Amino acid sequence: MWGNSVRMRLSKRAFSEKQEKSIAKELGGKVTPNSGGLRTVSSWKGDINTDTEKLECKITNSSKYTLKFSDLSKIRSYALKYNRDPVFLFEFASGEYKDKYVCLFESNSCEPLTQKSLLFSSADLFKRQKLNTLVYQFKYTDKGVDRGISVYTYRHYLTIRNNQ
């Protein structure tokens, strides 16, 4: 009765919901119900809301993840509208280099990238985190304005967050 694509979508949704619930619990936030599937009011956009942050969470079983700059722009827009800090989290959920990473909007001196996305490899990010707590830094252009992004491990993000 159910096709493979329906089962796959349901399992992806359950996979994402499990990630969101776990992170929301750890951060003391609330999960946005069916955030990717409904046209919710903008105050609930984003996967997780805390008192000070609005988070968008992505998860993959692949060893590669494509970060779309449009996703960064959306979470920034939703967060700032409600006076919250935008946080974009992506997770490599399987494989030798599984880990979570957080993108924060921070100034930097990088030249703006011209592409619309960035491909991350779990192995590359894992190696980079051994060298520095700041795993990656870049700039992209959003509606004519350059936005600096810093990528940290989720563990380091928790340290930053708890020291504020």
Where are these regions (language model features)?
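Catalytic phosphate/metal-binding cores of nucleic-acid and nucleotide-processing enzymes, i.e., regions
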Residues: 1-164
